[in-house]
């Protein structure tokens, strides 16, 4: 006989789908008057949304239909897509508690890595953010900057050994992925994944690196989980997924989840033991006890009461959340910078000159201090402009917890010809916020908004941009989101990028090869060397420069 739990899931799923279809086609929605692109009756706009080159479709939608657009998902379920600054402020800042990040009781990320900061809501999120804010402070970044330099020097040595005296085609994206994982490991967890002397064989590191590539093979998994998550408990959902024999990627995702949980638990226990032995024991660990998890654990152990502490489940979840949130986003941002520098050799040479001069001032063999590094104008301009035009995440999602009204900065023309100044959202409506679209809005940034021009950051920004009050946490940009749910580690990520560029550019030149590079849209944008390939890869011609 079939497993009773599967029968219950099938019945619940069928009933839920019937209700959705009934509700969609018999009840008129306030979103019906918004402009919208063509969609299919069953899948809606999902084929375009999950397509690997969907960034082209998003640009078309943004330019054609404006800053408030109706999209559809399965069975005509309606969604709002917006990149209007006032709407984003309302959703991310003013009424953030009424727009939870989760679309259900849990989603596939919490199912596989636990209730970390990215996925916590309400009081749980506020408590976690309160504990984590101090460990991402500027003072903490100064403490770990030498760790970043140490990893960067190892990378420089490894690349020199590979290229020798001649230029070589190297998978730069692969090296950036290994390096950012090691930086996150040492400065974040006090753990080393990679010695750069050979291919990595660390099971924890391999699990972390595999998480997003595997989840990319099951793009509809999150929709399946979200559809049923409000109706069945987490333990039952995991049991159902274990029975997904025809879907090997789902089973692999479960194994990856188990490896991450097991290794995180072991690392946490080792750190707790070292903390109990005192500072001398911490000094001998990777990160010397100044890594983020050691600082967090120490603060947590010294909390005034047990009720104020983070429980072990949440501490474990922070580890995988921290790595997964920072690894591909930072490594692919670095890859994008190096790709753009290879396309613009004049910019590369100008930046190399600034970085070489900064290193000469502090003296050979010494690190450029944190406070000097973050003030280098052209380095900052290159990083800002790349993150403006190519944010690692193109979109973020929210859900209306109740009937809401979203104001717009400027009206859009409705399908009935009237001007729409605000959008009424029925409860449970899913909202997609266009981060890249806001960053490249010509009304705010000018006609050259789609051009990569680092020099724009060396002069006053457009007055329209200042007046729009974009709610981003970083430089009038939405690249790291905004409000209390903005990226807590954006300065950490910037420091990683700037340290690596400071070491790599004076040491190597980067040129394009004969093969084109394709950038693909996924949970995080990633490069491939073939338009049909799913393997993250970016070949550049790398040549060692005279020391």
Swiss-Prot record:
Question: What is catalyzed by this enzyme?
Answer: lanosterol + reduced [NADPH--hemoprotein reductase] + O2 = 26-hydroxylanosterol + oxidized [NADPH--hemoprotein reductase] + H2O + H(+); 26-hydroxylanosterol + reduced [NADPH--hemoprotein reductase] + O2 = 26-oxolanosterol + oxidized [NADPH--hemoprotein reductase] + 2 H2O + H(+); 26-oxolanosterol + reduced [NADPH--hemoprotein reductase] + O2 = 3beta-hydroxy-lanosta-8, 24-dien-26-oate + oxidized [NADPH--hemoprotein reductase] + H2O + 2 H(+)
Protein task: Cytochrome P450 monooxygenase that is involved in the biosynthesis of ganoderic acids (GA), a group of highly oxygenated lanostane-type triterpenoids which well recognized as a main group of unique bioactive compounds in the medicinal mushroom Ganoderma lucidum.
Q: Under what name is this protein listed?
A: Ganoderic acid synthetase CYP5150L8
- What cofactor does its activity depend on? heme
The root-end lineage is:
Eukaryota, Fungi, Dikarya, Basidiomycota, Agaricomycotina
Encoding gene, per UniProt annotation: CYP5150L8
GO MF annotation, one: monooxygenase activity
Keywords on record: Heme, Iron, Membrane, Metal-binding, Monooxygenase, Oxidoreductase, Transmembrane, Transmembrane helix
Question: Where in the sequence is the signal peptide annotated?
Answer: none
Where located?
Answer: Membrane
Family assignment? Belongs to the cytochrome P450 family.
Entry GO CC? membrane
The Gene Ontology biological process annotation of the record reads: terpenoid biosynthetic process
Please report the record's description of how this protein sits within the membrane: Single-pass membrane protein
* Protein's pathway: Secondary metabolite biosynthesis; terpenoid biosynthesis
**What Enzyme Commission number(s) does the record list for this chain?**
1.-.-.-
TM spans (from-to): 2-22
Binding of heme, residues: 487
Deleted gene: phenotype: Leads to a significant decrease in the titer of the 4 ganoderic acids Mk, T, S and Me.
Supply the induction statement.
Expression is induced in ganoderic acid (GA) producing conditions.
């Amino acid at each position: 006989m079939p497993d009773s739990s599967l029968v219950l899931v099938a019945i619940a799923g069928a009933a839920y789908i019937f209700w959705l279809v009934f509700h969609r086609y018999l009840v008129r929605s306030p979103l019906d008057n918004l402009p919208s692109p063509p969609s299919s009756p069953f899948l809606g706009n999902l084929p375009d949304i999950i397509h690997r080159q969907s960034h082209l479709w998003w640009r078309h939608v943004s330019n054609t239909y404006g800053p408030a657009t109706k999209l559809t998902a399965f069975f005509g379920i309606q969604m709002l897509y917006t990149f209007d600054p006032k709407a984003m402020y309302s959703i991310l800042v003013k009424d953030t508690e009424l727009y939870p990040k989760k679309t259900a009781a849990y989603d596939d990320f919490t199912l596989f890595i636990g209730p970390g900061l990215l996925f916590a809501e309400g009081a749980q999120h506020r408590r976690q953010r309160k504990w984590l804010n101090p460990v991402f402070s500027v003072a903490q970044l100064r403490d770990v900057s030498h760790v970043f330099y140490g990893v960067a020097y190892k990378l420089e040595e490894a690349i020199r050994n590979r290229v020798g005296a001649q230029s070589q085609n190297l998978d730069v994206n692969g090296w950036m992925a290994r390096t950012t994982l090691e930086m996150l490991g040492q400065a974040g967890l006090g753990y080393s994944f990679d010695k750069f002397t050979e291919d990595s064989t660390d099971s924890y590191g391999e699990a972390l690196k595999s998480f997003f590539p595997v989840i990319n093979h099951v793009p509809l998994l999150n929709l399946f989980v979200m559809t049923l998550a409000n109706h069945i408990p987490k333990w039952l959902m995991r049991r159902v997924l274990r029975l997904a024999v025809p879907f090997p990627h789902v089973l692999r995702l479960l194994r990856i989840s188990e490896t991450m949980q097991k290794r995180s638990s072991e690392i946490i226990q080792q750190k707790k033991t070292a903390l109990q032995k005192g500072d001398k024991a911490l000094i001998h660990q990777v990160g010397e006890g100044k890594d983020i998890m050691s600082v967090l654990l120490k603060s947590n152990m010294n909390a005034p009461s047990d009720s104020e502490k983070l429980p072990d489940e949440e501490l474990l979840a922070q580890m995988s959340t921290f790595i997964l949130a920072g690894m591909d986003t930072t490594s692919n941002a670095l890859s994008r910078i190096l790709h753009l520098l290879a396309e613009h050799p004049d910019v590369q040479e100008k930046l190399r000159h600034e970085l070489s001069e900064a290193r000469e001032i502090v003296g050979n063999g010494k690190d450029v201090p944190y406070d000097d590094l973050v003030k280098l104008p052209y380095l900052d301009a290159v990083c800002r402009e790349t993150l403006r035009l190519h944010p690692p995440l193109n979109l973020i999602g929210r859900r209306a917890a109740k009937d809401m009204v979203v104001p717009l900065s400027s009206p859009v023309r409705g399908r009935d010809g009237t001007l729409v100044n605000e959008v009424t959202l029925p409860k449970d409506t899913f909202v997609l916020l266009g981060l890249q679209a806001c960053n490249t809005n010509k009304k705010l940034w000018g006609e050259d908004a789609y051009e990569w021009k680092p020099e724009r950051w060396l002069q006053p920004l457009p007055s329209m941009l200042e007046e729009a009050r974009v709610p981003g946490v970083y430089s009038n940009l939405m690249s790291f989101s905004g409000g209390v749910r903005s990226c807590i580690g954006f300065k950490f990520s910037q420091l990683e990028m700037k340290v690596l560029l400071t070491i790599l550019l004076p040491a190597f030149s980067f040129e394009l090869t004969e093969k084109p590079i394709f950038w693909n849209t996924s949970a995080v944008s990633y490069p491939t060397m073939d338009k049909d390939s799913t393997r993250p890869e970016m070949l550049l011609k790398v040549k060692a420069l005279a020391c």
